[in-house]
Amino acid sequence: MVKPTDYLTVTALTQYLKAKFERDPYLDRVYLTGEISNFRLRPNAHQYFSLKDNKAKISAIMFKSAFEKVKFTPEEGMKVLIVGRISLYEASGNYQIYVERMEPDGLGALYQAYEQLKAKLATEGLFDAPKQPLVRFPKRIAVITSPSGAVIRDIITTTQRRYPIAQLVLFPAVVQGDGAADVLVERLKQVNEHGDFDTIIIGRGGGSIEDLWPFNEERVARAIVASQIPVISSVGHETDTTIADLVADVRAATPTAAAELATPVLTDEILKLQQQRLRLYQAFSKTVALNKKQLDHLQNSYVLKQPKRLYDGYLQNVDQLQRRLLTAQQQLLKDRRQQVQLLQQRLMAQSPLMAVRQAQKDVTEQQRRLNQAMNRLMADRRQKAAQVIAALDLVSPLKILGRGFAYVTDDQQQMLKKVADFKTQQPIELHVQDGLVTAEVVATHKGEE
């Protein structure tokens, strides 16, 4: 019979199975190929997905530190090659693969990442964005590259040969390996912060796709696009084309070509200036000679020898114009006088004095009518006031007192109207027509109702 102690807990069984997985040397390093399923990119976090074929599926997890080393972006349905270890997740009891490395099945991981980024930036229009023109005669050129490679030597040699008056400033950078992309971005920012450079040359010599990879990083490409200073990219050999080459303002096949694009040939420019100076001198001399010839011709002309003949014909015209002007002025004054006289006659006919006199008559008549209306109104008001006074007099208390009546108040001047208001021996006051009588209540008798 099975004892209770023979039963395992779920935790104990799960831990036992997990130990089996982790101790199995065949499961400690597993190479899998399959199709990505249930993948949703989680920025700056662990990635959870499944790997499947046509018959089976296994859960997969890739920690953030391992996923940051993946050069391409995994996509749903993509076939990949995975290296990892198999273990069991105790909380769910599911076994899964912990992915340590992943790359596309078929294409190399770097090439896949290159194509993905190239398509992304092309969709954003970064490759077709307007390019900054290079400064024709640069004073200062910033070079971002390795301080020990052949690139900087070629650029220095070419620049000194072609345009020695330009100042080259090296911004040393790591151009391959981990951290190189961050250094390149930082150097681009430093050059732009200085603000006194005319051109930037960024690049390195040839190498494998892994060696050139920092120049295919998205952050480097965006730093080049954001640069306010024109950027010449010279990465790898002529057959190598990096993302940096595609977004730069100008791409150079070699470092020497980059220096040639950045600088003119000083001797050629001096020769051009000399030729332009000679052409300018010849043109100026020709113009001076032509003007001198024209001046001599004018000085010897018949007209200039007798200049009065130039304006003899105009003097007669001036006299005629003066006479016509005088006649026109006189006629204009005559017309204006006639107009003034006519206006004066009209004003006299419509003199304001007549209007004022008529207005005075109107005002006098209005005052007369107003006085009559006021007199009628006052008489009417006096009559109505007399009627009101007579009506008031009929109901006046004094009038009633005059007919022999009186009214009684107590010592507080309160009106006493009923028998109940009087008290025996209460002092009272009788108000009569011509004065006041003080009395005292002896007795009260209530009359019949």
UniProtKB/Swiss-Prot annotation:
Keywords: Cytoplasm, Exonuclease, Hydrolase, Nuclease
Catalytic activity line of the entry: Exonucleolytic cleavage in either 5'- to 3'- or 3'- to 5'-direction to yield nucleoside 5'-phosphates
EC number: 3.1.11.6
Keyword Secreted in record: no
Top-level lineage group: Bacteria
Chief localisation class: cytoplasm
GO terms for MF: exodeoxyribonuclease VII activity; nucleic acid binding
Location of this chain's protein in the cell: Cytoplasm
InterPro entries: Exonuc_VII_L (IPR003753), Exonuc_VII_lsu_C (IPR020579), OB-fold_nuc-bd_dom (IPR025824)
One GO cellular component, as annotated: cytoplasm
GO biological process: DNA catabolic process
Subunit composition and interactions: Heterooligomer composed of large and small subunits.
Record-linked NCBIfam families: xseA
Family: Belongs to the XseA family.
Protein purpose: Bidirectionally degrades single-stranded DNA into large acid-insoluble oligonucleotides, which are then degraded further into small acid-soluble oligonucleotides.
Stored PANTHER family: EXODEOXYRIBONUCLEASE 7 LARGE SUBUNIT (PTHR30008:SF0)
Protein name: Exodeoxyribonuclease 7 large subunit
The organism of origin for this protein: Latilactobacillus sakei subsp. sakei (strain 23K)
Phylogenetic classification of the source organism: Bacteria, Bacillati, Bacillota, Bacilli, Lactobacillales
Gene behind this protein: xseA
